[in-house]
From Swiss-Prot:
Gene source species: Coxiella burnetii (strain RSA 493 / Nine Mile phase I)
Similarity remark: Belongs to the SmpB family.
SS bond list: none
Record protein name field: SsrA-binding protein
Alphabetical UniProt keywords: Cytoplasm, RNA-binding
Protein task: Required for rescue of stalled ribosomes mediated by trans-translation. Binds to transfer-messenger RNA (tmRNA), required for stable association of tmRNA with ribosomes. tmRNA and SmpB together mimic tRNA shape, replacing the anticodon stem-loop with SmpB. tmRNA is encoded by the ssrA gene; the 2 termini fold to resemble tRNA(Ala) and it encodes a 'tag peptide', a short internal open reading frame. During trans-translation Ala-aminoacylated tmRNA acts like a tRNA, entering the A-site of stalled ribosomes, displacing the stalled mRNA.
Amino acid sequence: MNKQISKKPAQRTIALNKKALHDYYVEQRFEAGLVLEGWEVKSIRAGRVQLRDSYVVFKGGEAWLIGAHLSPLPNVAEYMKADPQRSRKLLLNKREIGKLFGAVQKQGLTVVPLDLHWHKNHVKVEIVLAKGKKTHDKRETIKRREWEREKHRVLKSHG
């Protein structure tokens, strides 16, 4: 009668920012909540989200997600002004905001969203403290990835 309960809650990914992994070295990860309107949650459920050119800025001691595109559904009420590119407040502890803000100011790092996912019944965004890659670093990453693929291909055919 003892049922084992999974310790790790299921996280369903809604949107990924693959470009962030290509353009930045990930230093540290944080999970933040989002302040959303009702139509935005419906759009997220429908998968109409894009994080490609989004980033995080700090204004007045708060963190804001800029550039995330949430396309409104066609049946959004006409009296609502649905702005797909609006700034969305991130819900973080003061300690986390201070740590991120300090790293951005002192070390010149960037804060970008990596993915949007469901945690229980809430939409969360995984933001990362990141350092920009140079062009030659990107090329090196691509070469390494292609070499790994080739290695696996050769081992698979001979094994």
